């Protein structure tokens, strides 16, 4: 492909309630999506933001990866591969992980991993892992380990077996983790795994409708060594959605209904409620572990920015997303390493697009000081 910068698609706006500056990064009338919120996809210097955009308007259309400056300028296409979406990708999007230094993007197409240069888009083949995947099976989900040596991939057919790829040698092998790799601790060579078989199905609701639910076993979080040994309990099933708290060994996430809180859990202690208030839905943490951003629902109270040391939070901005069942309507906010940029998605225009909110130091300090949106909005 010919890699050249595209014209900016940015639309700048100010949240009318909070005064926070928000930039719509993608505006072309095709679905766009940011990266999952469990791992940074903003370069450590806050220069570039990575996101996906669908190549054309069709149910199984492929997704390409772009980078853009944090101010919405210098839109640049990094990848263009395959003619259809990834069958076992994240809603059709190929799994991708940014390296610790933000210079390399590891992208999984099929069962083959490539390294993509974030500045130029040049691709390098890292490893083809077809020999570890049986017929009808596939690799999905990616977790980058402590010090960036290994990437763990889930086997779609198994809830216990992963593939571990050594980026130094290119050697890939099966490893029994006893669950699905959900994240890698960055303070020690351990992996957070979710044990239990998740089987998605539906159940009736009191109003005669149906809702999606897990018909399998309740998940439990453990940590294991990078070879699957030394299993340690983190916590039972308390989270609706969770991630590691940045580079720490703690886990943060939103409580299961009827809880309206963000939990913090770690090995050797009881989970604690960091804060309570609206129904926190999906939450991502800054790499330094100081900030958490969460969307809300039932009702939508906007994105909430939480200061971890104090547990104080305020409304950052309102996304205007539908927040309905389909994934495109979820804001799924993620936050930069230093907590100064928050990226989210909204289908407010009728087509899902990617946005960034710029968090001012004044706003951060107001949260630390315990300032509320309005006195009457205080949650008890």
Predicted regions: what they are:
Residues 1-23:
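Blade/loop signatures of beta-propeller domains
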Residues 31-38, 60-106:
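Blade-loop segments of beta-propeller domains
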Residues 35-39, 87-97, 134-143, 182-191, ...:
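Repeated scaffold domains used in trafficking and secretory/extracellular systems
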Residues 49, 105, 150-151, 198-199, ...:
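Hydrophobic beta-strand positions that form the internal "hydrophobic ladder"
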Residues 80-161, 174-184:
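Asp-box/WD-like beta-propeller blade repeats and closely related beta-sheet repeat scaffolds
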Residues 238-239, 275-284, 312-335, 373:
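Conserved blade-ending motifs and adjacent loop-strand segments that build the rim/top face
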Residues 258-262, 272-312:
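Loop/turn-rich, solvent-exposed surfaces of beta-rich toroidal or solenoidal domains
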Residues 328-380:
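Blade-level signature of beta-propeller repeat domains, shared across WD40, Kelch, NHL, RCC1
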């Amino acid at each position: 492909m010919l890699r050249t910068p595209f014209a900016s698609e940015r639309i700048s706006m100010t949240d009318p309630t909070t005064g926070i500056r928000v930039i719509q990064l993608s505006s072309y009338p095709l679905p766009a999506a940011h990266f999952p919120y469990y791992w940074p996809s903003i370069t450590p210097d806050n220069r570039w933001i990575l996101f996906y955009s669908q190549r054309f308007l069709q149910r199984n259309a492929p997704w390409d990866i772009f980078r853009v400056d944090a101010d919405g300028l210098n839109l640049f296409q990094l990848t263009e591969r395959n003619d259809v979406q990834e069958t076992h990708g994240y809603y059709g999007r190929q799994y991708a992980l940014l390296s610790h230094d933000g210079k390399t993007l590891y992208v999984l197409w099929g069962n083959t991993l490539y390294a993509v240069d974030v500045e130029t888009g040049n691709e390098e083949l890292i490893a083809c892992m077809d020999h570890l995947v049986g017929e009808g099976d596939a690799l999905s989900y990616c977790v980058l380990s402590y010090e960036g040596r290994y990437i763990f991939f889930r086997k779609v057919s198994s809830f216990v077996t992963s593939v571990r790829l050594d980026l130094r040698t290119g050697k890939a092998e099966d490893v029994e983790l006893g669950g699905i790799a959900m994240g890698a601790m960055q303070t020690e060579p351990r992996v957070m795994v979710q044990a239990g078989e998740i089987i998605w199905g539906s159940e009736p609701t009191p109003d005669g409708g149906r809702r999606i639910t897990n018909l399998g076993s309740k998940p439990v979080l453990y940590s294991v060594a990078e070879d699957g040994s030394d299993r340690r309990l983190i916590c039972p099933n308390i989270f609706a959605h969770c991630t590691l708290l940045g580079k720490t060994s703690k886990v943060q996430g939103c409580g299961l209904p009827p809880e309206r809180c963000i939990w913090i859990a770690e090995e050797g202690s009881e989970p604690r409620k960091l804060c309570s208030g609206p129904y926190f839905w999906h939450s991502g943490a800054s790499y330094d572990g100081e900030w958490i951003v969460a969307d809300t629902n039932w009702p939508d109270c906007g994105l909430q920015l939480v200061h971890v040391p104090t547990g104080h939070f305020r409304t950052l901005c309102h996304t205007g997303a539908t927040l309905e069942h389909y994934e495109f309507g979820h804001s799924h906010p993620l936050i930069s390493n230093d907590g100064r940029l928050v990226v989210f998605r909204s289908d407010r225009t009728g087509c899902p697009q990617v946005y960034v909110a710029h968090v001012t130091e004044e706003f951060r300090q107001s949260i630390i000081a315990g300032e509320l949106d309005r006195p009457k909005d205080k949650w008890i």
